[in-house]
Amino acid sequence: MLNQNEFDLWAEGYDRSVGVSEEENSYPFAGYKAVLGTIFQTVMEKPHAVVLDLGFGTGTLTAKLYENGCTVYGQDFSARMLELAAPKMPQAHLYQGDFTQGLVEPLLEQRYDFIVATYSLHHLTDAQKLSFLRVLREHLNPGGQILIGDVAFETRGELEQCRKDAGDEWDDEEVYFVVEELKKAFPTLDFLQISFCSGVLSLGRAAEET
């Protein structure tokens, strides 16, 4: 996993790096715009939604949500990413913090209609993902959703095939989602495949839950 200084150094070229990978339809960012677009459209179905973005980066998605009337909260590991994102949404509540250690205190005091994470939670181990998702679910409003856009696969076999095809480009420090395995802990998890290596996972909190 990148440390904070490495994340800060990557911040300046992040959007460019993503664009090259997506245009070439290559791992890891094939389908990137469609992933973000799917999450954006889902959030827009609820007017004036309260949204928490985990790993907001340069604010590509978060700023669009902000511009369209959402109340935005966010946490990112990189101080430089926060500096780049904050001017795009001056009234948003953005914090620096390592979410492998959980949410920063001010974010724990809120409930959200949507908690979104795009290409960020793969920095957690599988065990950390399970624990973190359970915590996040408790911070949803009734009827709320966790929306995760990331490198993700329906099966372990599909992941291994992508690893083989990617060769030296594969990042062994990142831990990607395998839906069939995650569903053992979260049977109501939904998955929309976007590209051969990406998709949107959604996990809700029932309207009757309080």
Placement of each model-derived feature along the sequence:
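Short catalytic micro-motifs in class I SAM-dependent methyltransferases
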Residues: 119-120
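A short glycine-rich, Lys/Arg-flanked "PGG" loop and its adjoining helix->strand segment in the class I
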Residues: 130-142
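Class I (Rossmann-like) S-adenosyl-L-methionine-dependent methyltransferase catalytic domain
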Residues: 1-43, 58-106, 147-210
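A conserved beta-strand element that flanks and buttresses the S-adenosyl-L-methionine
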Residues: 116
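Conserved class I S-adenosyl-L-methionine
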Residues: 48-55
